[in-house]
Amino acid sequence: MGRAALTAADTRVTVAGTAAGAQCLIDGDPATELLFDGSPEAVIDLVTDADMDLRNITVWPARRPIRAEAELQVKGADGYRTIASFGIDRSNPNIEVGFDPYAPVSVSVAKTTGREFRLIVRGAGKDTGFAEVLLSSLPRVERYAEKTFAKMFQSPLPYWEEYQWRDQPALDDASLAVDPAKVVDITECLDGDRLVWEAPAGEWVVMRTGMRPTGIQNSPAAPEGTGLEVDKMTPAYLQHHFDAFIGEILRRIPAEDRRTFRVVVADSYEKGGQNFTDTFLTDFRERYGYDALPFLPVYDGVVVGSQDISDRFLWDMRRLAADKLAYAHIGGLREIAHKYGLTLWLENYGHWGYPGEFLQYGGQSDEVGGEFWGEGSLGDIENRAASSCAHIYGKRKVSAESYTSAGNDFGRYPAMVKPRGDRFFSEGINNTLLHVYISQPGDELPGMNAWFGTEFNRNNTWFSNIDLFTA
């Protein structure tokens, strides 16, 4: 098999079209980075003195946004030939589109033997770059960061195929995959920060894993109402979240004084993925009939069973997450609202990476709504998602957060935004929620306004004629 991976001790790295210091790409230190100089193409050559059997390339981007196309080549008797072509998209570092902003890009290749490899990077742009490039004879799960929600689609409008990944090359040597039957849980052997374990004979890899928050916070919100996003997969936490927000309103306003308080609103989902919860292992076994614990290394790209089996486990995980988002989170929120005589109104779609399904998700709410902006393309899929959900689940009213915007304060007027409204009313929207109306109790101009939304309020010069627009 040869060496397991190319390292700084046995490999020479050169890069055409960029500065010196390319050896940092294989020094094992993600803090050292090689930046490109803006040339249309960067050519990275990795040369070693002995053959290796390549099965995976993993690229760690430098900690700055990058989008590029890459080709991996190997040199043979007839020169270089391409063995893998792949995209690198870490263009949006917001954790709402992946809680690991610069997650590694892992690509599998069929076993390829060689000692001279070339990585061609096109379109990366100036001052983007890589921290590490790992060529390995050991297999890894392809695109494991994307498949675990650590890195999600980078722009607002993912198409269906964006979460449909190719079949990985089958392993030529099954012994290179971890046997799930040989994964041992040694949690009980931990004594504080020490591991006290009588390991059976053989070679073992000890992996420590755990659960932590994604770090994503709710927004937009007042400072005193801002904190970590609630767990979407455990109903008990949702009840606590409801009590801390809506519960405060219910406690402070007597029931006889809140006759107009009837609806709880959940906005569009823009808070990234979640791939674990306290009850995940129990829930997983109940759903699928097998134990997820031996497959936890797959979260870090380790192949367990086979490439295909590892992918199937990750599919099951994502399916469970989507179901929990629909039934535990939205279904749970609806049930809690009903206990207080309230109903749930939901924008049943997600932006910038969304771990659920629009129709299933929306079906658990009392009412659904879409959204559209007065200009641009935002809204092109959201309103069909809402109207389709309403048709399927028998919901007669289909609302939309309407005519929203950003910037150009007081620069919009009805004739400017009307074409967008006409379009989405023809796609099934039959109830509009003007975005945004803010009460103006004072007479100072321009009054109180948000940075988002068209100013539907009495301080706008055309507001006295708004009935001609909304009638």
PLM regions with names:
Residues 86-127:
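Beta-sandwich interaction modules
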Residues 24, 97-102, 153-252, 281-321, ...:
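Active-site-adjacent "subsite" loops/lids of carbohydrate-active enzymes
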Residues 1-24, 34-37, 46, 52-56, ...:
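Carbohydrate-binding surfaces of carbohydrate-active enzymes
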Residues 46, 118-123, 206-211:
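Short, hydrophobic/aromatic-enriched beta-strand segments in well-ordered soluble domains
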Residues 54, 114, 125-175:
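Exposed low-complexity, polar/acidic, P/S/T/G-rich flexible segments that act as propeptides
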Residues 42-44, 68, 105:
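Residue-level marker for the onset of beta-strands and adjacent loop->beta junctions
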Residues 4, 68-76, 169-177, 181:
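Extended low-complexity, serine/threonine- and proline-enriched intrinsically disordered segments
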Residues 31-42, 94-101:
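Extracellular beta-rich ligand/substrate-recognition surface
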